[in-house]
Regions:
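Membrane-entry segments of alpha-helical transmembrane domains in multi-pass membrane proteins
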Residues: 1-10, 26-33, 74-92, 130-143, ...
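Hydrophobic alpha-helical transmembrane segments of polytopic
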Residues: 5-12, 35-45, 86-93, 121-124, ...
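Hydrophobic alpha-helical membrane-insertion segments
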Residues: 37-54, 178-190, 384-392, 468-488, ...
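Membrane-interfacial helical/loop segments at transmembrane boundaries in membrane proteins
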Residues: 59-75, 197-213, 402-413, 486-519, ...
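Aromatic-capped, Gly/Pro-kinked transmembrane alpha-helices
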Residues: 73, 485-530, 541-653
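Hydrophobic transmembrane alpha-helices and their helix-loop junctions in integral membrane proteins
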Residues: 99-143, 149-464, 475, 481
């Protein structure tokens, strides 16, 4: 199996290198064929691995491939840990990446950087595979940073746009903040456990109970919180969420890949993998749960006031990541991964469908300038409808099972603040349904607001775009029904996660729900279902029936609207504190260190000192030869006298 695992990781990397170095000579067709072939190989082998480990209950594979370096007793190796958790992630990442690769053929066909883009997205896939399959913290960090680096390149791919450069710089800097906490957490793991290997670390987890840092703070709590800071950056949790909406400046295919299956899911996966550590600290779990609830609720509210088609979907990603994080906080790791999986399919679908609309409308992204597109773009409309129903949790669709399980898990949690969190995630159902259906209604229903010239030439997009939409629509509908029982109730992920016996949310879920059908029959009597129905009705009311009401409410509640439009002031706050603060600090250091110390003290000061010394020596330079001869004789006598004294020589022996 080791050759299979190596092939999964290396196939996209080889494709990326070949196309990256020789794309111009290879041409467009051969370039995308090579990268798609590499990802296809990884996808097929990922399904094979899934079949071996999950369906046929194969043994966990945990083996080092080679040792990178040895420092004392510390071995830093490159290896693979492949269990059921890894297998599920491999299928999700590879399949979504393959769909994005195929979609890119149609979306980027006129772009000058066509071959370079294919090279980048294949490299992105390799980085995510490295992260998911790692068996130690160092390799995890390598994949973690590689994902961040390639996302920087892809968000700023259209570097001729100033907004794209600002967005990729923001993403890079914000993630460095999270990564700083992450690497500190890894350093503490090394300090307390003496190893970076997962298995060795987890086997010693009980030894850290009761240990403290600085005599006051629980060591395991500090470690988990620092690791979670890294997850907050990658998975865009408040307040490190500000980079994700800006990532829309990149081409739509990479928006889909980042938001669905790679970068933003890295933090969710990492916390799930670290479940043996997080289960030792209720404080850390509570923080994770509360941060997730804040993100789910307040980022969803921002989706209501967005008019850019991609940004509406982007804020839905932020909100759904909040739901996943809430599930992690209540120790429902399998539920979080379940929602990660279902979300990957329908969120990739929604982004690619948005891209289809953008291409058809000649890169128009304002939903207020759309409308009535369902007749001209039936495939895009139907797939968008299916993806939207999955996102809002309509009964029977993929998102319904995973989102409802998160809400129920919170309901059974006994952590502090779980009552408030339950309120937040239930209210989030209404908000999600509202902004999602508002988007669908404004884009595809009602009267057309498209300009006449564009409307005359409006038609469905090419098969390279619509086929991935259809392929992603299928799991967006059925994947939840077919996987909820084995994944949540049958223990698919039991060998990849650990739950302490004191945390009973998942056990209570298993006790109350036994099948997909029981969940559907139960849902119609629950508050989340009626919140979803209310969100749909409200969206229809404001988007189609009484469109003028939206403007009236905007004017009446202009302060609330201002807060939402200004994104709660996070960007403004960051600019004042960090951007301007950094400029002022840099200016101060420039004045003190550069101007005062270096220029005035060292450079000019040394010149002034030389001039001062020279003022004493200058009178000696008279220009008369006999003066110089006199000084030479005196100097020679002094030197001779010093030599005689030093050698203890006497003329009187």
């Amino acid at each position: 199996m080791i050759n299979t695992y190596l092939t999964i990781v290396l196939a996209p990397l080889i494709g990326s290198i070949v196309v990256g170095l020789g794309g111009n000579r290879l041409g467009r067709t051969l370039s995308h064929s090579i990268t798609i072939l590499g990802v296809t190989i990884s996808t097929v082998l990922s399904f094979y691995v899934f079949n071996h480990h999950v369906l046929n209950e194969g043994e966990i594979f945990n083996q080092n491939i080679y040792t990178w370096m040895q420092i004392g007793g510390l071995n830093i190796s490159f290896g693979f840990l492949v269990d059921n958790l890894t297998s599920v992630m491999l299928v999700v990442v590879s399949f979504v990446s393959l769909m994005v690769h195929i979609y890119t053929i149609g979306y980027m066909h006129e772009d000058k950087g066509y071959t370079k883009f294919f090279s980048y997205i294949s490299l992105f896939t390799f980085a995510m595979f490295t992260l998911v399959m790692s068996n130690n913290f160092m390799q995890l960090f390598f994949g973690w940073e590689a994902v961040g680096l390639v996302s920087y390149l892809l968000i700023g791919f259209w570097h001729h746009k100033e907004s794209a450069i600002e967005a990729n710089l923001k993403a890079f800097i914000v993630n460095r903040v999270g990564d700083f906490g992450f690497i500190l957490g890894i350093a503490l793991v090394l300090m307390f456990f003496g190893t970076l290997d997962y298995a060795e670390t987890f086997s010693q987890k009980d030894q850290i109970i009761g240990l403290t840092l600085f005599n006051d703070f629980s060591a395991i709590t500090v470690i988990c919180l620092l690791l979670f800071v890294g997850a907050m950056g990658k998975s865009a949790q408040v307040p490190l969420h500000v980079w994700l909406p800006g990532s829309m400046e990149g081409p739509t295919p990479i928006s889909a890949l980042i938001h669905a299956a790679t970068m933003v899911t890295a933090g969710i996966f990492m916390v799930s993998r670290m479940s043996p550590l997080f289960e030792l600290s209720d404080v850390a779990l509570t923080v994770v749960m509360v941060i997730g609830a804040i993100t789910a609720l307040f980022m969803g509210l921002l989706g209501i006031v967005q008019n850019d088609i991609k940004k509406v979907v982007a804020y839905s990603t932020l909100s759904q990541l909040g739901y996943m994080t809430v599930a992690l906080g209540v120790s429902a790791y399998s539920v979080a991964i379940f929602h990660l999986m279902t979300h990957a399919f329908f969120k990739a679908l929604l982004f690619l469908a948005a891209g289809s609309v953008i291409v058809a409308l000649h890169h128009e992204q304002d939903i207020r300038k759309m409308g009535g597109l369902r007749k001209k773009m039936p495939i895009t409309y139907i797939t968008s409808l299916l993806g939207t129903l999955a996102l809002i949790g309509f009964p029977g669709f993929a998102g319904f099972y995973s989102k409802d399980m998160i809400i129920e898990a919170v309901h059974y949690s006994e952590l502090p603040f779980s009552g408030w969190v339950y309120f937040a995630v239930v209210l989030g159902v209404f908000i999600t349904a509202f902004y999602s259906m508002r988007l669908l209604f404004l884009v595809f229903h009602g009267e057309s607001r498209v300009d006449k010239h564009t409307e005359e030439h409006l038609h469905e997009t090419a098969p390279s775009i619509t086929v991935p939409l259809i392929m992603l629509a299928i799991p967006s509908v059925v994947i939840g029904y077919f996987t909820i029982e084995p994944m949540l109730f049958g223990g698919w992920l039991d060998n990849g996660i650990y739950i302490d016996t004191s945390h009973e949310s998942v056990e209570k879920l298993k006790h109350h729900f036994h099948s997909a059908f029981s969940l559907i029959s139960h849902s119609v009597m629950t508050l989340p279902f009626w919140m979803m129905v209310g969100g749909i009705a409200t969206a229809w009311l404001f988007s189609l029936y009484r469109t003028e009401w939206a403007d009236i409410i905007q004017r009446r509640f202009k302060r609330i609207n201002y807060v939402l439009v200004s994104l709660y002031g996070f960007d403004r706050l960051n600019e004042i504190i960090f951007v301007r603060g950094a400029l002022k600090l840099g200016n101060l250091l420039w004045k003190i260190s550069d101007m005062a110390i270096i220029d005035q003290l060292l450079v000019n000061g040394s010149a002034r000192f030389a001039r001062f010394v020279g003022s004493f020596i200058r009178p000696v330079q008279t220009g008369y030869v006999y003066h110089y001869a006199f000084f030479m004789i005196i100097s020679l006598m002094l030197v001779l006298g010093w030599v005689l004294v030093a050698s203890d020589y006497s003329f009187y022996s």
